[in-house]
Every structure is written in C-alpha cells, then in structure tokens.
Amino acid sequence: MLHDSDNLVAESLVLMLSGTAQWELNTQKGLEMLYQQNKTLKSQFQQVDGSGLSRYSLASPRGLLETLDKIYETIGTSKIKTLLPQTNSEGTLIRFAPQQNLDFVYAKSGSLRNNHALAGYIFSKANKPYAFVISVNNYTGDKEAIQAAIGAQLSFLHKKLR
C-alpha cells in the first residue's frame, strides 16, 4: 500500500480497525483507536478519513516528523527501504524530479492544489536514515518546478550527510 497510494485500502484498514473493538464499522471510531495507540506523539492530527491528505485532514510537518521517528523506532532501518517507495524508481515517486538522481530518498508525497509535501527518510552515504518533511504551501507555479526545488534541497542535504 505504501508504494502505490490506494485510498480505498487505507480507508478500509481504518474501518477494519474499528471493527476489532465493536461490531459496527465506523471511520471515526477507527481513527480514535489510532490516536489512543499513538498517545506518545506530541502533535495532534485532525483526520476525517483513512485516506490521508485531504482539505479536511490536518497534519503539521512536526507531526509528520514525529510519526516518522516513531516508525523508525518501531521497524528500524532495514524495513524502511522495503515499505516506502524509492524516489525516481517506484510507486508514486517514479517521476519525482526526474532530472536528479535521488535514489537515497524513500518517502511519500502528497499534493493538493497549491500545496505539496514530501515526507520520508534520506539515507546518508553510510546508510543512516534521517527523517525529513518538506511542505510547500500556497505556491502558484507548476508541480514539476516545486519537485525540482525539493530535489535540489535533498541533493544538497545528502552531500552534507556522512
């Protein structure tokens, strides 16, 4: 599910989670269960469905970064590369900033009109993962220009990492 975005599957998982605590399948109950399981996160999310990015769901870059840190603590380095798509080669990131080689980035993207976000891990030359979130809001240019700028920042950062 993480390599190719599938909102139907994501929504179904939230509904199934709610069904483990009650007989009725209910999105809000499933989301409440997710919040209860992740009480250690300091940032709060406002989620209206299981699909993730929408005009009604709210998540801050800090909240996404906390989530990435928790994922790393839970599954470690080896599984990150199998779960998230690699930039420029698979999933929803297959055409992300194609003019740059970003094979050291494993992430998920989200975009709505005039908003673009990329969250995931950048791997150093020593194969150490660093969580990152880049969120660009209220831009009026085309998405490809934003992706190229994000790609340039990630390339710059990768050169600085050891």
Regions found by a protein language model. Name each.
Residues 2-78:
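A small/polar active-site loop signature that marks catalytic segments
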Residues 6, 52, 112, 137-139:
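Short, glycine-/Ser/Thr-/acidic-enriched flexible segments
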Residues 138-150:
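A short acidic/glycine-rich loop-to-helix N-cap element
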